[in-house]
Amino acid sequence: MDSKSRGKSRLNRSILTLVSFFGLVLFYLTWYLYTRGLTGADSPGCRIVYMGPSYARITAFDESHTKFASKYSLYLYREQGRDPLPDENEGFKHLGGIPILFIPGNAGSYRQVRSIAAETSDIYFDHYLDQPDGLNPNAKNYDFFTADFNEDFTAFHGRTLLDQAEYLNEAIKFILGLYANSEHPPRSVVVLGHSMGGVVSRVMVSLPNYIPDSINTIITLASPHAAAPLTFDGDILKIYSAVDRFWFQGYDNKETDNTIAKIAKERLSKISLISITGGLLDSILPADYTTLGYLVPPTNGFTVYTTGIPGVWTPIDHLAIVWCAQLRRRVSNALLEIANFDSPDKTYSLEKRMEIMRKNFLSGFEDYTSQDKVAYDKPADHILLKADSQQINFVQEGQKLKVTPGKMPSPLNVFRLPSPKVSKVQFSLLSSMDIGELKSDNNEGYTQPTLLLCNTMDAIKEDANIIDFTNKETTEIVMFKCIDVRDDSNMIPRSAVGTYSLSESSIGGDKSPFYAIQYNSTILKQYDTVIVTGSLGMESNDNENFLLAELSDYNSSQFNIHEDLFSLMTRGAKFSLPLDKPLSMNIKIPGAWSSILAYKLKVSWPEDRETTEYIPVFRTFIRQWSNEPYEVKWHVNIEANNQVLLNMHGIAPYTPFKVKSKEEYGLNIEIWTDSIPDKSLTTIRLRIDLLNSLRLLVLRYRLATISFCVSIILLALVFQVKHYKETNKFPTFLYGLSCICSPWVFGSILFTLSILTPIMSIKPLQKFLNVIDPVVLQDSNEINLSLTDEFKLNSFFLGLEEKSLWFIGPVFFVMGLGIVSLTFYSLLVAGNVIASISRVLLKRLKLSQTEKKQPNPGKLWANRRIIGVLFVLLVIPIYMPYQFAYVVSCIIQSIQVIKILVADKTNKSILNYHLSLLMLMLWVLPINVPILVVFVHNMTINWTTPFSSHHNFLAILPVILLMERYSNSRTLPKMSQTKYKVTQAFLAYYVFYCLVYGIRHTYWIHHLFNLLCCWLLVLHYDAQDDTSDHVQ
């Protein structure tokens, strides 16, 4: 090697060291930020729960009903002191409630049903048993059934997921049979699924053994509907693809002659599906994966985040979502409200169920909930109101009505609504007390505020039921025809002095929440007057009570920040709010629509604000919101913490999103503030927080670690093979990595990765990549694209829609380079340590020369290897998964490397080659481990049925044969120019596949490695034939 080559080599090594160090620092920083606790609206706030659980196993559900009876079990939950326990003699013949089935998730327990089941029983027996007014008169307690899957790994193994779905369909048939002797036997059950249990519930409906109409309501908790969380198993992806297609066809409005589509329409038409997700606190599953997307229309379901559910207002981690006190209260209330014991389905109609679900799980500010508002329906029951014009306080547009204890401007405060043709207006009301009912028997001294939407009348019949606000001194009468809209009030978190967390006013909190109502012109156009009446109670000692109401111009309450994503990233956004700002203002940020970016908002006030004599009745708070999915977060007491970290779930990698203007996906910030007269919020600054954005990459790109690291190892092999072809010496793996870091190569790689992000979202290119994907070529039903043109799905490379995030690819590559370098050095150190210990042990054994020269030991070992290979190839097709053989192959290769290290004088080329091969095998290993975990788990529970998938011995045969051939420490044979080009072309395609397809089709990385081993075998046998011909 000349001095110029040595200089380049030293430069490459220096760059490699620098880049690897930077990559490891970046990786550590990302992991540190991910494990650091969350604050503000993203901090945990669940309360502890208590219950008295008991479980009765239903032994009658045995092999005569299902072939899975020896593996799975069915239980009935009973709350001690509440639910009657089954009699030993009568068994389950006299069940009197409504059947509901709980499905645990990946490695979940049947006992996880206890929290929601206990709360449902408590609410029913404490509140519903006597059927008081205001509660569902047709409600009945639920009989909670739950499946014991022995903590099966449904996220790892597609066949296991199908087994569970098939078992549960048979379980539902059995459960309904338990009620056969009831006076009104049910024909369906409610399904409650956690994690992968929610996916199982969707699979159930698509199977042949599904009983028509046996499921009509599904509630899922943190269930990955939009995408499979792990892609180590091809069966999982096939199931997702088939089930998604079934559900899409079931709700597709297009006429079709397809038999499966017709079946899907019949089965799904009356099913409601609600997907509840815990948001950012879920450290196991990306919350983006829980969206329903194009699978379920708004008439049949929606996705909602727990941060926006009234009274919950907290993100919830993956396991806590089944026991969180606030959420279980909401879920239990919803279950009891949809119950209709008089119906054969034991629930109300789809329309009423959806209305109940929207009221229980959505914040009430969404346009989607307008259809459920009293003001929207304009009910037939009206309130006729007779008022004294002298007692009316007319509140002008833009003027705030302020009511505090004992201080009511007038018994009747009236907002006159302009014609919608003249101007669009918005009415906002905020109160520390719930909106009360206006009663006809008492028109004085109301202790709760009342809100009415009215139309002015000319006359009222004398015999009509009138609420009269007039007296003997009244000279001018004004008459109104009104509706009471108290049911339209939305519970929101308290934001006052001394309030620092959302949990303080959530369900079970020490402080009372606030209540708000907001109407736009779409609803207000039906009326000409808004009336606020009632006081906050003269006798009230709570001086913190208040009511604020305002009618404002709609346009004055809407602001747009026009900066795009690139502008927000580079310079941020800054703006000031007007002096005459309304009670609530919505700020739309069209450029902020990415799920993998965090945003920092800073609110600043004038310096002299604290010196003013005006005392706000509440502290400024922010409602952060977005639609599809419905995500709301509340940031309270902004004065105490004026810097807010905003995380959102908008357009996310690998999940379908509706094709529409990006502005419609933008983040919305609604600021509620009690304005100081003639003062203004000085500035609001918004910028992208790149540091906190790093933590958002972990869950969404955990599989990218494998694909990027494998691609880097393969790139190193490309340069190693090139050097071997030129010099007939196989260089070290470090040489391959240093070649990657040569300035020209490294720059080219970073440039390529940078342009991959923007071009991979181009639709024609996506269609082409889909066509040439070997997974799609194998099965045309497994597509990487959305099933409908109304939605878009980015499945390739990093799955990004944001062209401004071109740098994410290079960042991952730098991280991967650091991880691969660390892996190599760790492997080398571990190998040398083990080799040194082995050499010492061999010396101490003091083997005699006679023992060393035993006749033909190699032949004996060769025979054993052949027997071992034959045994493995025999058991794989009938019992063991091929992943077991791969793990054994990795162990064999590790031993092979140690043997080479022990033989200190061995040719370095052999060591370098085998060490590089071991690096590749070890990074492919994680793809195979999950299936092996499922296999071992089945063995531990004495599930004697042979493993039902992954028995293709061809998927491992080349690997086994190559390991057997390398038992004598061989290296690559000499290659002709043609074979060299084929080898390099295959390695290049392998790199391409890992980067473009590898994250969502990870399991195919193993199959490509298997093909690589097959090609290496061809090279060896061809070289052997050439040698034989030469000898002859």
UniProtKB/Swiss-Prot annotation:
GO process annotations (BP): endoplasmic reticulum to Golgi vesicle-mediated transport; GPI anchor metabolic process; protein transport
Keyword S-adenosyl-L-methionine: no
Active site: S195
Molecular function in Gene Ontology: phosphatidylinositol deacylase activity
Pfam families hit by this protein: PGAP1 (PF07819), PGAP1_2nd (PF25141), PGAP1_TMD (PF25140)
Positions annotated with a glycan in the UniProt record: N12, N520, N555, N784, N907, N938, N942
Cystine pairs: none
One cellular-component annotation, GO: endoplasmic reticulum membrane
SUPFAM superfamilies to which the protein is assigned, alphabetical: alpha/beta-Hydrolases
Transmembrane feature ranges: 15-35, 703-723, 740-760, 805-825, 861-880, 884-903, 916-936, 943-963, 985-1005
Membrane topology: Multi-pass membrane protein
UniProt EC number: 3.1.-.-
Domain of life, source organism: Eukaryota
Coiled coil: none
Keyword terms: Endoplasmic reticulum, Glycoprotein, Hydrolase, Membrane, Protein transport, Transmembrane, Transmembrane helix, Transport
UniProt subcellular location: Endoplasmic reticulum membrane
Summary of the function given for this chain in its UniProt record: Involved in inositol deacylation of GPI-anchored proteins which plays important roles in the quality control and ER-associated degradation of GPI-anchored proteins.
Family: Belongs to the GPI inositol-deacylase family.
The name this protein goes by in its record: GPI inositol-deacylase
Species for this entry: Debaryomyces hansenii (strain ATCC 36239 / CBS 767 / BCRC 21394 / JCM 1990 / NBRC 0083 / IGC 2968) (Yeast)
